[in-house]
Amino acid sequence: LVYFCLIFVLAMFPYILCNLELIPRKSFKVFMGDSGSFFIGFTIVWLLIESSQAMSSLRESAILRPVTALWLIAVPLMDMVMVMARRIRKRQSPFTPDRMHLHHICQRLGLSSRQTLCVIVLLASLHMIVGVYGQRFNVSESIMFSLFWASFFCYATVITYSWKITRFVRKHQSKRKNINEHP
């Protein structure tokens, strides 16, 4: 399992280097497409299920607890649930595309693509740290699950009011811009 994870990460490394423009004097953009994204998502979920279940095909005992797996994929999981719930509430197909994902909201707030990436990576890292901490120090699964739901509630509240937050930020930015232009 460790070798598979290592190969998986190494295979994605060139993609990350190109899209973050980390190759000196070269500018490449690689579009993964739906199939690539679905494959990565499927592989990550498969790895989490495989590592969180005892008596799996690869070993006798679980590497991590199921609640830890939730923490490791918290941000994409919460984003997906919120987007699908919003679409269903609007009587749309949950698979209809829209621009209401977390990265769209961050960009509407005026963040650049790189800043948006940093915000999402920071948010995901914080959730992962909580999950790994709970696993490492053997915090009760019921406490970790309750904390996960509390985190989800906070995320849902912020996303639900994202339009108001966006309007407030833009209004505040325009006031600041007007003050700077007219001293």
Which residues make up each language-model segment?
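Alpha-helical transmembrane segments
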Residues: L1-L109, S113-K177, E181
